[in-house]
Protein backbone atom coordinates (compact mmCIF):
# COMPACT_ATOMS: atom_id res chain seq x y z
CA UNK A 1 0.00 0.00 0.00
CA UNK A 2 1.46 3.32 -1.08
CA UNK A 3 1.81 6.24 1.31
CA UNK A 4 -1.14 8.58 1.02
CA UNK A 5 -0.51 12.15 -0.04
CA UNK A 6 -2.63 14.95 -1.42
CA UNK A 7 -2.35 18.40 -2.88
CA UNK A 8 -5.87 19.22 -1.63
CA UNK A 9 -6.49 21.57 1.29
CA UNK A 10 -7.14 19.39 4.35
CA UNK A 11 -10.46 19.53 6.16
CA UNK A 12 -10.33 20.67 9.76
CA UNK A 13 -12.05 17.54 11.10
CA UNK A 14 -13.26 14.39 9.34
CA UNK A 15 -15.32 11.66 10.98
CA UNK A 16 -14.66 8.01 10.12
CA UNK A 17 -17.18 5.52 11.50
CA UNK A 18 -16.34 1.83 11.56
CA UNK A 19 -12.74 2.66 12.44
CA UNK A 20 -12.14 -0.68 14.18
CA UNK A 21 -13.09 -2.69 11.09
CA UNK A 22 -10.82 -4.05 8.40
CA UNK A 23 -11.19 -1.09 6.06
CA UNK A 24 -11.43 1.32 8.98
CA UNK A 25 -7.95 0.37 10.16
CA UNK A 26 -6.58 0.95 6.67
CA UNK A 27 -8.34 4.30 6.27
CA UNK A 28 -7.13 5.45 9.67
CA UNK A 29 -3.70 5.60 8.04
CA UNK A 30 -4.53 6.69 4.50
CA UNK A 31 -6.95 9.48 5.44
CA UNK A 32 -4.43 11.34 7.61
CA UNK A 33 -3.40 13.84 4.90
CA UNK A 34 -7.00 14.90 4.29
CA UNK A 35 -7.76 16.46 7.67
CA UNK A 36 -6.04 18.22 10.54
CA UNK A 37 -8.04 16.04 12.94
CA UNK A 38 -9.45 12.59 12.16
CA UNK A 39 -12.26 11.59 14.52
CA UNK A 40 -12.44 7.79 14.72
CA UNK A 41 -15.48 5.92 15.94
CA UNK A 42 -16.69 2.37 16.43
CA UNK A 43 -18.61 0.33 18.97
CA UNK A 44 -15.64 -2.05 19.16
CA UNK A 45 -12.32 -1.38 20.84
CA UNK A 46 -9.92 0.86 18.91
CA UNK A 47 -6.28 1.73 19.37
CA UNK A 48 -5.75 4.93 21.39
CA UNK A 49 -5.54 8.27 19.61
CA UNK A 50 -2.11 9.13 18.23
CA UNK A 51 -1.05 12.70 18.91
CA UNK A 52 -3.25 15.74 18.43
CA UNK A 53 -4.41 14.75 14.95
CA UNK A 54 -6.69 11.91 16.12
CA UNK A 55 -9.78 11.67 18.29
CA UNK A 56 -11.18 8.28 19.34
CA UNK A 57 -14.82 8.12 20.36
CA UNK A 58 -16.73 4.89 21.09
CA UNK A 59 -20.27 5.12 19.74
CA UNK A 60 -23.21 2.78 19.22
CA UNK A 61 -24.81 3.83 15.93
CA UNK A 62 -28.18 2.68 17.25
CA UNK A 63 -27.96 5.36 19.98
CA UNK A 64 -29.35 8.56 18.46
CA UNK A 65 -28.02 10.90 21.13
CA UNK A 66 -24.55 9.36 21.01
CA UNK A 67 -24.42 9.77 17.22
CA UNK A 68 -25.47 13.42 17.50
CA UNK A 69 -22.59 14.03 19.92
CA UNK A 70 -20.25 12.17 17.59
CA UNK A 71 -21.08 14.31 14.55
CA UNK A 72 -20.85 17.68 16.28
CA UNK A 73 -17.97 19.75 14.94
CA UNK A 74 -17.03 17.68 11.89
CA UNK A 75 -16.78 18.94 8.30
CA UNK A 76 -17.59 15.68 6.50
CA UNK A 77 -18.48 12.10 7.38
CA UNK A 78 -17.09 8.86 5.98
CA UNK A 79 -19.70 6.36 7.11
CA UNK A 80 -18.11 2.90 7.14
CA UNK A 81 -19.73 1.75 10.38
CA UNK A 82 -22.30 -0.97 10.91
CA UNK A 83 -22.63 -4.71 10.43
CA UNK A 84 -20.51 -5.66 7.41
CA UNK A 85 -21.59 -9.27 6.84
CA UNK A 86 -24.88 -11.10 6.46
CA UNK A 87 -26.63 -11.55 9.80
CA UNK A 88 -30.21 -11.95 11.06
CA UNK A 89 -32.26 -8.88 10.27
CA UNK A 90 -32.64 -7.94 13.93
CA UNK A 91 -28.85 -7.64 14.24
CA UNK A 92 -28.59 -5.49 11.14
CA UNK A 93 -31.50 -3.24 12.08
CA UNK A 94 -29.84 -1.21 14.82
CA UNK A 95 -26.47 -0.37 13.29
CA UNK A 96 -27.30 -0.37 9.58
CA UNK A 97 -30.90 0.85 9.39
CA UNK A 98 -31.34 3.02 12.48
CA UNK A 99 -27.65 3.90 12.38
CA UNK A 100 -27.66 5.45 8.92
CA UNK A 101 -30.74 7.49 9.82
CA UNK A 102 -29.00 8.75 12.95
CA UNK A 103 -25.93 9.72 10.89
CA UNK A 104 -27.95 11.75 8.39
CA UNK A 105 -30.16 13.36 11.00
CA UNK A 106 -27.08 14.36 12.99
CA UNK A 107 -25.50 15.73 9.80
CA UNK A 108 -28.62 17.82 9.20
CA UNK A 109 -28.70 19.09 12.75
CA UNK A 110 -25.01 20.02 12.80
CA UNK A 111 -24.78 21.46 9.30
CA UNK A 112 -22.57 18.77 7.74
CA UNK A 113 -22.99 18.95 3.97
CA UNK A 114 -20.91 16.02 2.68
CA UNK A 115 -21.24 12.32 3.49
CA UNK A 116 -19.35 9.42 1.96
CA UNK A 117 -21.52 6.34 2.40
CA UNK A 118 -19.91 2.91 2.25
CA UNK A 119 -22.55 1.08 0.26
CA UNK A 120 -21.90 -2.34 -1.22
CA UNK A 121 -22.02 -4.50 -4.32
CA UNK A 122 -24.59 -6.54 -2.38
CA UNK A 123 -27.13 -3.86 -3.29
CA UNK A 124 -27.12 -5.43 -6.77
CA UNK A 125 -25.94 -8.93 -5.87
CA UNK A 126 -28.68 -10.90 -7.63
CA UNK A 127 -27.53 -9.82 -11.08
CA UNK A 128 -25.70 -12.57 -12.96
CA UNK A 129 -22.00 -12.31 -13.64
CA UNK A 130 -22.64 -12.23 -17.39
CA UNK A 131 -24.61 -8.96 -17.05
CA UNK A 132 -23.18 -5.44 -17.18
CA UNK A 133 -25.02 -2.87 -15.10
CA UNK A 134 -24.68 0.78 -14.11
CA UNK A 135 -25.78 2.99 -11.22
CA UNK A 136 -29.24 3.44 -12.79
CA UNK A 137 -29.94 -0.30 -13.04
CA UNK A 138 -32.68 -1.42 -10.64
CA UNK A 139 -31.25 -2.57 -7.34
CA UNK A 140 -31.42 -6.29 -6.58
CA UNK A 141 -30.19 -6.81 -3.01
CA UNK A 142 -28.92 -10.28 -2.25
CA UNK A 143 -29.24 -10.30 1.55
CA UNK A 144 -30.48 -8.45 4.63
CA UNK A 145 -27.09 -6.73 4.57
CA UNK A 146 -27.65 -5.70 0.95
CA UNK A 147 -31.13 -4.46 1.83
CA UNK A 148 -29.66 -2.27 4.57
CA UNK A 149 -27.21 -0.71 2.11
CA UNK A 150 -30.00 -0.13 -0.39
CA UNK A 151 -31.92 1.66 2.36
CA UNK A 152 -28.82 3.75 3.06
CA UNK A 153 -28.70 4.88 -0.56
CA UNK A 154 -32.35 5.92 -0.33
CA UNK A 155 -31.59 7.82 2.86
CA UNK A 156 -28.76 9.63 1.06
CA UNK A 157 -31.04 10.54 -1.84
CA UNK A 158 -33.77 11.81 0.49
CA UNK A 159 -31.43 13.95 2.58
CA UNK A 160 -30.02 15.55 -0.56
CA UNK A 161 -33.44 16.29 -2.06
CA UNK A 162 -34.89 17.52 1.23
CA UNK A 163 -31.92 19.17 2.94
CA UNK A 164 -29.15 19.56 0.37
CA UNK A 165 -26.74 17.16 2.11
CA UNK A 166 -24.54 15.73 -0.64
CA UNK A 167 -23.45 12.10 -0.65
CA UNK A 168 -21.24 9.86 -2.70
CA UNK A 169 -22.48 6.29 -2.19
CA UNK A 170 -19.65 3.90 -2.98
CA UNK A 171 -20.79 0.40 -3.88
CA UNK A 172 -17.62 -1.26 -2.66
CA UNK A 173 -16.69 -4.45 -4.48
CA UNK A 174 -14.12 -6.50 -2.56
CA UNK A 175 -11.48 -4.37 -0.84
CA UNK A 176 -8.74 -6.65 0.44
CA UNK A 177 -4.96 -6.78 0.06
CA UNK A 178 -5.53 -9.10 -2.91
CA UNK A 179 -8.44 -10.95 -4.56
CA UNK A 180 -9.22 -14.18 -2.76
CA UNK A 181 -11.15 -16.05 -5.47
CA UNK A 182 -12.31 -15.91 -9.09
CA UNK A 183 -15.27 -13.66 -8.35
CA UNK A 184 -12.99 -11.11 -6.73
CA UNK A 185 -10.93 -10.87 -9.92
CA UNK A 186 -13.84 -8.72 -11.15
CA UNK A 187 -14.84 -7.03 -7.89
CA UNK A 188 -11.45 -6.29 -6.34
CA UNK A 189 -10.73 -2.77 -5.08
CA UNK A 190 -7.19 -2.11 -3.89
CA UNK A 191 -6.67 -0.05 -0.76
CA UNK A 192 -4.82 2.57 -2.80
CA UNK A 193 -7.67 2.85 -5.31
CA UNK A 194 -10.16 3.09 -2.45
CA UNK A 195 -8.20 6.04 -1.07
CA UNK A 196 -8.09 7.65 -4.52
CA UNK A 197 -11.86 7.26 -4.79
CA UNK A 198 -12.43 8.72 -1.33
CA UNK A 199 -10.34 11.75 -2.22
CA UNK A 200 -12.48 12.38 -5.29
CA UNK A 201 -15.64 11.82 -3.25
CA UNK A 202 -14.55 14.34 -0.62
CA UNK A 203 -13.38 17.12 -2.91
CA UNK A 204 -15.48 16.96 -6.09
CA UNK A 205 -18.05 19.79 -6.01
CA UNK A 206 -21.77 19.46 -6.72
CA UNK A 207 -22.07 15.68 -6.44
CA UNK A 208 -25.71 15.74 -5.30
CA UNK A 209 -26.26 12.07 -4.61
CA UNK A 210 -23.79 10.18 -6.78
CA UNK A 211 -23.55 6.39 -6.83
CA UNK A 212 -20.21 4.94 -7.90
CA UNK A 213 -18.96 1.37 -8.04
CA UNK A 214 -15.81 0.95 -5.97
CA UNK A 215 -13.64 -1.26 -8.14
CA UNK A 216 -10.10 -1.22 -9.45
CA UNK A 217 -9.04 -1.27 -13.10
CA UNK A 218 -9.64 -5.00 -13.45
CA UNK A 219 -9.60 -6.78 -16.81
CA UNK A 220 -13.16 -8.08 -16.48
CA UNK A 221 -15.72 -5.86 -14.75
CA UNK A 222 -19.50 -6.00 -14.49
CA UNK A 223 -20.09 -2.38 -13.53
CA UNK A 224 -20.27 0.73 -15.73
CA UNK A 225 -19.34 3.93 -13.87
CA UNK A 226 -20.35 6.45 -16.54
CA UNK A 227 -22.94 8.11 -14.29
CA UNK A 228 -20.17 8.94 -11.82
CA UNK A 229 -17.87 10.48 -14.43
CA UNK A 230 -17.92 13.85 -12.64
CA UNK A 231 -15.81 12.28 -9.90
CA UNK A 232 -12.99 11.74 -12.40
CA UNK A 233 -12.06 8.56 -10.54
CA UNK A 234 -9.15 6.84 -12.29
CA UNK A 235 -8.15 3.54 -10.63
CA UNK A 236 -4.54 2.53 -11.14
CA UNK A 237 -4.41 -1.03 -9.83
CA UNK A 238 -5.62 -4.27 -11.42
CA UNK A 239 -6.38 -7.76 -10.16
CA UNK A 240 -4.51 -9.24 -13.14
CA UNK A 241 -1.25 -9.34 -11.19
CA UNK A 242 -2.89 -12.03 -9.03
CA UNK A 243 -4.32 -14.03 -11.95
CA UNK A 244 -1.97 -17.01 -11.74
CA UNK A 245 -2.42 -17.36 -7.98
CA UNK A 246 -6.23 -17.28 -8.22
CA UNK A 247 -6.37 -19.57 -11.26
CA UNK A 248 -4.38 -22.17 -9.30
CA UNK A 249 -7.30 -22.58 -6.90
CA UNK A 250 -9.71 -25.51 -7.43
CA UNK A 251 -12.47 -24.63 -9.88
CA UNK A 252 -15.90 -24.28 -8.16
CA UNK A 253 -18.95 -25.98 -9.65
CA UNK A 254 -20.68 -24.10 -12.45
CA UNK A 255 -23.79 -23.62 -10.30
CA UNK A 256 -21.87 -22.36 -7.28
CA UNK A 257 -23.35 -18.93 -6.39
CA UNK A 258 -19.81 -17.54 -6.36
CA UNK A 259 -19.60 -18.36 -10.08
CA UNK A 260 -23.13 -17.25 -11.02
CA UNK A 261 -24.14 -14.12 -9.12
CA UNK A 262 -22.40 -10.80 -8.76
CA UNK A 263 -23.01 -10.97 -5.01
CA UNK A 264 -21.51 -14.44 -4.75
CA UNK A 265 -22.28 -16.53 -1.69
CA UNK A 266 -24.41 -13.81 -0.10
CA UNK A 267 -27.36 -14.87 -2.27
CA UNK A 268 -27.47 -18.19 -0.38
CA UNK A 269 -27.01 -16.87 3.17
CA UNK A 270 -29.86 -17.31 5.68
CA UNK A 271 -32.65 -17.38 6.61
CA UNK A 272 -31.16 -17.74 10.05
CA UNK A 273 -32.74 -20.17 12.48
CA UNK A 274 -35.21 -21.41 9.85
CA UNK A 275 -34.68 -25.04 8.93
From Swiss-Prot:
UniProt KW keywords: NAD, Nucleotide-binding, Oxidoreductase
UniProt-recorded Gene Ontology molecular function terms: nucleotide binding; uronate dehydrogenase activity
InterPro entries in the record: Epimerase_deHydtase (IPR001509), NAD(P)-bd_dom_sf (IPR036291)
Residues engaged in binding NAD(+): 22-23, 42-44, 60-61, 80-84, 149, 175
Source organism superkingdom: Bacteria
Residue ranges crossing the lipid bilayer per the database entry: none
Residues annotated as catalytic: 145 (proton acceptor)
pH note: Optimum pH is 8.
Involved pathway(s): Carbohydrate acid metabolism; D-galacturonate degradation via prokaryotic oxidative pathway
Keyword match NAD: yes
Thermal characteristics: Activity increases with increasing temperatures between 4 and 42 degrees Celsius. Activity is below 20% of the maximum after exposure at 37 degrees Celsius for 30 minutes.
UniProt keyword Disulfide bond, yes or no: no
Reaction(s) this enzyme catalyzes, per UniProt: beta-D-galacturonate + NAD(+) = D-galactaro-1,5-lactone + NADH + H(+); beta-D-glucuronate + NAD(+) = D-glucaro-1,5-lactone + NADH + H(+)
Binding residues for substrate: 84, 120-122, 174, 183
Disulfide pairings: none
A Pfam family reported for this protein in Swiss-Prot or TrEMBL: Epimerase
UniProt record similarity statement: Belongs to the NAD(P)-dependent epimerase/dehydratase family.
Biological role stated in the UniProt entry: Catalyzes the oxidation of beta-D-galacturonate and beta-D-glucuronate to galactarate and D-glucarate, respectively. Cannot use NADP(+) instead of NAD(+) as cosubstrate.
Subunit field text: Homohexamer.
Protein name (database record): Uronate dehydrogenase
Organism: Pseudomonas syringae pv. tomato (strain ATCC BAA-871 / DC3000)
Amino acid sequence: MASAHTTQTPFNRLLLTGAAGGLGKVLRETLRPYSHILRLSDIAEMAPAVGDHEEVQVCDLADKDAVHRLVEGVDAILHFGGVSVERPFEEILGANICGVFHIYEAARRHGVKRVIFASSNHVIGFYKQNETIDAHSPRRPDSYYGLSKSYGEDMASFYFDRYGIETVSIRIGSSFPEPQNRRMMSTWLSFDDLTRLLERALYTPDVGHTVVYGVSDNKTVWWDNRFASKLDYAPKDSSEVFRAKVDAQPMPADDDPAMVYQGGAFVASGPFGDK
